[in-house]
Amino acid sequence: GLGKKDLKIHLTLIHFTFYKTKMNLNDLSNISDNFKTTQKMPVLFLGHGSPMNAIEENIFVQGFRNISKEIPKPNVIICISAHWFTNGTFVTAMELPKTIHDFGGFPQALFDVQYLAKGNPELARETAELLSPVLVEEDHNWGLDHGAWSVLRHLYPDADIPVIQLSI
């Protein structure tokens, strides 16, 4: 698995790159071209834009599909979503996370979407342990909100990769 130090470095990089600077995705792409290639999977920051992108065919979602063709297929996905508001830090730890439609005022077709990826309780426990001394609690109720599934359904439409979601 991902070492504690590596996970903290990756989370710090995401925070620094996107919240402390004025960088955009093109800037990040230019920087990442200079990173040494390793056997580790890349860390991606992907905003979903309008929730309608989950069901529309446009250049925005084609970009997601292109990304999935350019990186190795992961064994599991840890998604940090800005749509899961919690008091504390939680990780989804269920076998079958539900698809959450946490929005309103959109066409029924968007509410009909189901992204039925499996969860990974073992990875959830490992993630909680790696982030120690931060208390990370296991959650068995949340699921995958649209910040996760609206992007993942374009990256991996077969939903054949286990996904856990982390709230920070």
Regions found by a protein language model. Give the residues of each.
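A generic structural signal for short, solvent-exposed coil/turn residues
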Residues: 17, 35-37, 158
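Internal, conserved structured core segments that host functional sites
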Residues: 124-168
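A short aromatic-anchored loop/beta-hairpin motif
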Residues: 24-130
